Amino acid sequence: MKAALIGAGEESLHTIQKAQELGVYVTALDGNPDAEGLKAADEGLTIDISDEKAVLDALQDRKPDFLITGPIGRYLTTAGAVNDALGLAGISRQAAEYCTDKYLFHKKLQEKNLRNCRCLLIPAEAAPAQAGDLARDFSTLQYPAILKPRYGSGSRGIFFLNNPRELEQALTCIFPENQDTAAPTEDYVLEEAAPGVEYGVDACMDKDRFRMILLRKKLITHPCQTGHRLPERKPREDETQRLLWERAAAYLTETTALLGLKTASSTQTS
């Protein structure tokens, strides 16, 4: 068996090791020539994983039986493109785009009433001088709210906002006052924070069937952008926990079907 690993950072080492223990020949790709996974794999290729064509060209003749990925964030779309082109099981490019584009994800779920908080797009092309105007445009927004990059993971660049004043301050960080003509290098989204307790979900797609593995409660520390993960707690086996599990599983089953996810593992926070 042959596998291609897209994204070969340090976090991929365990995956490579386990694949090799099963007798799988691993070809790893990463744009960083010093990536740890390139050295650990049976074959390492220095290729920018954001370049779908270059990745496809490299794998076309190698004909991997399946893909394995590290935490590659936005460029999960490259894995989807490879799966589509080579007819491999796993996430499609369209499904990967839904999962990595936070604004598109919101719009897609909103179509089926699976998400009811307001979510607004702040494009990178917006002029810095508009920061104050943008804050006024969002005057009907309900707080708390979250401002975050349209793409990315790991709580990167997140602002947790409790009032309009904090929103204006956050927009000033995105639009530096001393750069009259500069614009943010990326789009942002501003959305109303869902009330209640935050939960993390670990799950996988068994073909087109959603299977939940772990449901864990999460707490937000201050400040939010420094991270908010805490050690997992073993859930109590009582009626409340059982009903919560069933409700989360039912919602995510509908969500994954809408996004077209098949044969994949995922972690989703709600």
Predicted regions and their residues:
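ATP-binding N-terminal substructure of ATP-dependent carboxylate-amine bond-forming enzymes
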Residues: 1-95, 128
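Hydrophobic residues in well-ordered beta-strands that form the structural core
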Residues: 28, 90-92, 118, 147, ...
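Short, charged, surface-exposed secondary-structure boundary motifs
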Residues: 37-40, 55-57, 98-104, 157, ...
